[in-house]
Amino acid sequence: MSKSLQLIVTVLCIFTILVLGEICLAKGQPLEEMVECKEVLWPEECKYDACAFACALKRHGKGGCLEGPDYRSACICQYACKRS
């Protein structure tokens, strides 16, 4: 067996063992109950694209503009969080 082929087989075996180990570890851990949380990212005038980007960046969620009672829009971020 050539050295390069031997190296490739070794790397693939190590990678497979690591992946299988991670899968076994993940199966053994209980899932935490997640709920939907909302957060006002900024209360001033909302631009939808900026709001969606900020929410995805900050909380890995989905952002949108919501009009408040005083007819101003705010950036509302919805994301999954742990139940407290």
Swiss-Prot record:
Q: Which domain of life is it from?
A: Eukaryota
Q: Which GO terms describe its cellular component?
A: extracellular region
Q: Does the keyword RNA-binding apply?
A: no
Q: Which keywords belong to this entry?
A: Antimicrobial, Disulfide bond, Fungicide, Plant defense, Secreted, Signal
Q: Answer whether the UniProt record assigns the keyword Secreted to this protein.
A: yes
Disulphide bonds annotated for this chain are C37-C81, C46-C65, C51-C75, C55-C77
**InterPro entries cross-referenced by the UniProt entry:** DEFL
Localization (cell): Secreted
Q: Which residues form the signal peptide?
A: 1-28
Q: What is its main location?
A: secreted
Question: Which Gene Ontology terms describe the biological processes this protein takes part in?
Answer: defense response to fungus; killing of cells of another organism
Q: Which Pfam families match?
A: SLR1-BP
Quote the PANTHER family the UniProt record gives: DEFENSIN-LIKE PROTEIN 122-RELATED (PTHR33830:SF10), DEFENSIN-LIKE PROTEIN 184-RELATED (PTHR33830)
Family to which this protein belongs: Belongs to the DEFL family.
What this protein is called in its record is Defensin-like protein 140
Q: Which organism is it from?
A: Arabidopsis thaliana (Mouse-ear cress)
